[in-house]
Swiss-Prot record:
Binding site for ATP: 31-34, 88-92, 415, 479-481, 495
Entry keyword Translocase: no
Chief subcellular location: cytoplasm
Organism: Clostridium tetani (strain Massachusetts / E88)
Gene Ontology biological-process annotations: protein refolding
Sequence similarity: Belongs to the chaperonin (HSP60) family.
EC number: 5.6.1.7
InterPro entries membership: Chaperonin_Cpn60_CS, Cpn60/GroEL, Cpn60/GroEL/TCP-1, GroEL-like_apical_dom_sf, GROEL-like_equatorial_sf, TCP-1-like_intermed_sf
Pfam family, one: Cpn60_TCP1
Keywords: ATP-binding, Chaperone, Cytoplasm, Isomerase, Nucleotide-binding
Subunit-structure text: Forms a cylinder of 14 subunits composed of two heptameric rings stacked back-to-back. Interacts with the co-chaperonin GroES.
GO molecular function, a single term: ATP-dependent protein folding chaperone
Descriptive protein name: Chaperonin GroEL
């Protein structure tokens, strides 16, 4: 049976939904700025989570009243979308959405046409975004990166850590965040290409204490076939033995007599050769082998391209300055591949990243790109307790996203200053149509909100601060941490352009659509009063 629905119209619908918007935004906005507080979230399992990450808080909010919940979910959409695009700035986005809805509803209630108001909002936001892009300046060097990260994470240490990581692996590199069981937070950088396959047999190690094998100036045989018969690779082995070099074999698998022969020779000390299985699966495996071949200047020996193992000569093998193999990983450092070919391969992967629609594929391509072009850095987060660890990890992930965004589109004065700076651009807009003008004014007013909130969270009167910032020269903003007015960029208080831009665009998009709501429909909750027969009150104690 279809559930009955309850329907609300016009003013009532908008008011109830606005209540939900306010509940969500008021919860999130206490975290804004350097003196913002945290919010604690109850978790069904384990310790509660303490965080100041807007989107993490927003995701937790579900309201009982269906209409209020609709409002809250709409604003949650703003936070999530901003998080997807820029990875940070979710609190700002939520705050802006609330401000636009609040100002907009005043006008719509007063009889303005919501469609025209929305038009005005869109015009003003376009103008503001243009203004933000004009004040934006590119990220220059490690200093800037450290600043962006430090502001986002509210922690100078983290800023330095991320800047170090970016410096080591370059903009193409991949930086991941992992939990560690130590107290401190540290950086681990893997130079060269690493994949997660280790030696096939522990007898192949060269250092029995560390249980790892390291091959200097090694040859690398790359194939997608299974090697069982030593005769297949004998010709090429003999050539390498004569040169006194070492060999790494990357193949689908190596077993039986072939494996036994290699191990026996290693133990006798005649020849050092380590075999590992090829990384990845299916098509991705082929691509990864191709990557390794490009990096080391070798060829993939595969029947698909008509190359057979017994025809392999030394010039088909890859070369690398050193290879390190542990039980779980293989790392190839300084492959001797042709620079131009590596560059072509990198560009090819970049093109695939642009085209792919699957998030999973994009991540895997990004990893391959990093291994070819930069390297991989791992930030290992440590803390005294689980609760603090989770909180730190969230902040580092946000800071990392902010840093990437800054590299892409540059930086602007932080602390809400950039929004205040573009108000005068919006003021230049004019419209003959009264209601469109109202939309423009709504945005003008909402752009003050971030500065107000940061001031308010620092215990200062927001109106005074915003007036002061608006009437100071460009680039002067309010430093809430030290309670003074400074040149934001010089003081190192910066935000990524992409984050600020996305926050405003997403907020305006959802908020202006919200204003055009004329009816809201929700399920009527069923009243389930009859307990099961024979078990009065039994159900109360159960979940």
């Amino acid at each position: 049976m279809e559930m009955a629905k309850s329907i609300m119209f016009g003013e009532d619908a908008r008011r109830s939904m606005q209540k939900g918007v306010d509940i969500l935004a008021d919860t999130v906005k206490v975290t804004m700025g350097p003196k913002g507080r945290n919010v604690v979230l109850d978790k069904k399992f384990g310790a509660p989570l303490i965080t100041n990450d807007g989107v993490t808080i927003a995701r937790e909010i579900e309201l009982e009243d269906a209409y209020e919940n609709m409002g809250a979910q709409l604003v949650k959409e703003v936070a999530t979308k901003t998080n997807d695009v820029a990875g940070d700035g979710t609190t700002t986005a939520t705050l802006l959405a609330q401000a636009i809805i609040r100002e907009g509803l005043k006008n719509v209630t007063g009889g303005a046409n919501p469609m025209l108001v929305r038009r005005g909002i869109q015009m003003a936001v376009e103008e503001a975004v243009k203004g933000i892009k004009e004040i934006s300046k590119p990220v220059e060097g490690k200093e800037d990166i450290a600043r962006v990260a430090a502001i986002s994470a509210d922690d100078k240490e983290i800023g330095k850590l991320i800047a170090d990581a970016m410096e080591k692996v370059g903009n193409e590199g991949v930086i991941t965040v992992e939990e560690s069981n130590t107290m401190g937070t540290e950086l681990d950088v893997v130079e060269g290409m690493q994949f997660d396959r280790g030696y096939v047999s522990p007898y192949m190690v060269t250092d029995t204490e560390k249980m790892e094998a390291s091959l200097d100036d090694a040859y690398i045989l790359i194939t997608d076939k299974k090697i069982t018969n030593i005769q297949e690779i004998l010709p090429v082995l003999e050539q390498i033995v004569q040169q006194g070099k070492r060999l790494l074999i990357i193949s689908e698998d190596i077993e039986g007599e072939a494996l036994a022969t290699l191990v026996v020779n290693k133990l006798r000390g005649t020849f050092t050769c380590v075999a590992v299985k090829a990384p990845g699966f299916g098509d991705r495996r082929k691509e990864m082998l191709e990557d390794i071949a490009t990096l080391t200047g070798g060829q993939v020996i595969s029947e698909e391209i008509g190359r057979d193992l017994k025809d392999v000569t030394v010039d088909m093998l890859g070369r690398a300055e050193s290879v390190k193999i542990t039980k779980e990983t293989t790392t190839i450092v300084n492959g001797k591949g042709n620079k131009k070919e590596i560059e072509d391969r990198v560009n090819q992967i970049k093109a695939q990243i642009e085209e792919t629609t699957s998030e999973f594929d994009r991540e895997k391509l990004q990893e391959r790109l990093a291994k070819l072009a930069g390297g991989v850095a791992v930030i290992k987060v440590g803390a005294a307790t689980e609760t603090e660890l989770k909180e730190r990890k969230l902040r580092i992930e946000d800071a990392l996203a902010a840093t990437k965004a800054a590299v892409e589109e540059g930086i602007i004065p932080g602390g809400g200053t950039a929004y205040a700076m573009v108000i005068k651009e919006v003021e230049k807009l004019n419209s003959e149509t009264h209601d469109i003008k109202l939309g423009i004014d709504i945005v003008k007013k909402s752009l003050e909100e971030p500065v107000r909130q940061i001031a308010c969270n620092a215990g200062v009167e927001g109106s005074i601060v915003i007036e002061k910032v608006k009437h100071s020269e460009a680039g002067i903003g309010y430093d809430a941490l030290n309670n003074e007015y400074v040149n934001m960029i010089k003081a190192g208080i910066v935000d990524p352009t992409k984050v600020s831009r996305s926050a405003l665009q997403n907020a305006a998009s959802v908020a202006s659509t919200f204003l055009t709501t004329e009816a809201a429909i929700a399920d009527i909750p069923e009243k389930n009063d009859t307990p099961m027969p024979g078990a009065p009150g039994m159900m109360d104690g159960m979940y």
